[in-house]
Each structure stands twice: as C-alpha cells, then as structure tokens.
Amino acid sequence: ESKKYFMYYRCFTREVDYANEDEDSLKRKQTTCVATSNDGITFSRPSLHIYPTKNGDPTNIIHHGPTAHNFVVFHGDLQRTGKRFIAIGGVDGVIPADSGIYLFGSDDGFHFDPLKDSPILTKKHNRDEYHSYFDSMNTVSWDTNREVYWVWLRMNSGVTGYHRRQTQYLQFEDIVNGNPSPLADVMMINATFNHYVSCVSLVASEKSASYFVAIPISFPLYESVLALSRDGITFVNPKEDISAYITDPFVDSRGPPTYEN
C-alpha cells in the first residue's frame, strides 16, 4: 500500500560489553532496526526518535529488549487486529515465567506496541516435554484463503542428533484473543535426514494458488536449499520436478559447502 519495502534486522546497543556481559544481559540489550526502500534494492535507514541516543540523536531502532532477538514483522488482517503491521517476538529463558511468544501491532511499521500483556504461546501449548525454542526466528503468515494465521515454531525432539530439529505449526482464527490449534509437525518428504525446515512463509502467486516457501537448514554443513508446499504442512524439494513450483534459486549460486552458521 505504501509502495515501500521494509527490512527489519537485529542489532545491539553500543553499550554492549561482549567480554563481560552474561547471556541474559545481552538478550535485554538487543534491538530491532529498520531500513526502507522504494525499489527493494537500495535501502536507507530512517531517522526516528522512537529510541534516540543518549544525546537525543535519531536512530533507526523500532524495538528493544529480549523479544528483539527474533522480532518478525508481517502484514496482518486489518479487520481482525486493527493493525496493518503485526510482529511476534520470542523470549526463551531470560525470565522463566515470561517464556513465550509475544504479539505486537503497528499502524506505520515503525511504532510497535504490545497487543497483549501475556504471550500468545507458551510452553504449555506443547504436546510433550520437549518444548519449542522461542529464541529461533519463528514466522507467521495470514492466510486469506483459509482465513487463519499460521505460526511456525522450531522444536527439538527427544532424540539426540542435529537432524532431529524440526518445525511445528499451529493456527489461530483470532491471533489476539483466540486459542491456537494443537501443534503438529511440518514434514519434508524428499529431503535427506540432515535437513530440517526453517523460516516458513506464505507467498501469494498471481499465476497459481498461493504456496508456502521454506528454507531448510542442514547440519553440520550449513547450506540453504528451497522447499515448497501447497498446504503448509508437507514440503518437497523441487529439484526433481520444478514445473509445479519455481526453480530452486540456490542450485547454481550456493558455492562450496561451509561450516559457518
């Protein structure tokens, strides 16, 4: 609507002392910054006074605190939430009683306020003793066809091994005041054992029905590949048959394997 691209990314305040900070202190000093663009190629940092410096100078910080660790912004359904922009942020272990995913709303993509004082998801929503880890980049999408919000969460099963990391999903009809559906696993039906789904998003397509895009992560070699789904539940790697989806953009540009995260 605004004909602008918004890019949100995590930062730390300049007061961080990496050598002497404990983990909880670092989490509290994290911030979320924003950059905008008219073409999606060249971005600039807006001068905002939401969180100015100690000298009163503007910054491009739009959020701070533990939930800035994975503050994810998306377009919500305006009629259901009253906000054009919705964001979620997960807290994991900073304050045990507060562990969960919190919901925020904004009219302009810059000024975010909590939509609820309590988290919309906590560890009590998990099926068993192996809880979701709210420190990951959990993602949300509004599904206009099904009229539900999808929430994808990282989860560790009780079996050791990197490949046992998995992604779960649940749905809200009302993400502000409603209750979530039971958690269920997202499946990869043609991937090798050492890939798990990460960073799922719903993409609207003009040529076909909307589809879901995921970027699976592999261990111990950190490589990104492409996975696609029509239902948001079962994903395939489209290497064998790309006609039903789109070409995997990582095949030729991935480069040599790397052990860096």
Please describe what each predicted stretch is.
Residues 1-261:
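Carbohydrate-active catalytic/glycan-binding domains of CAZyme proteins
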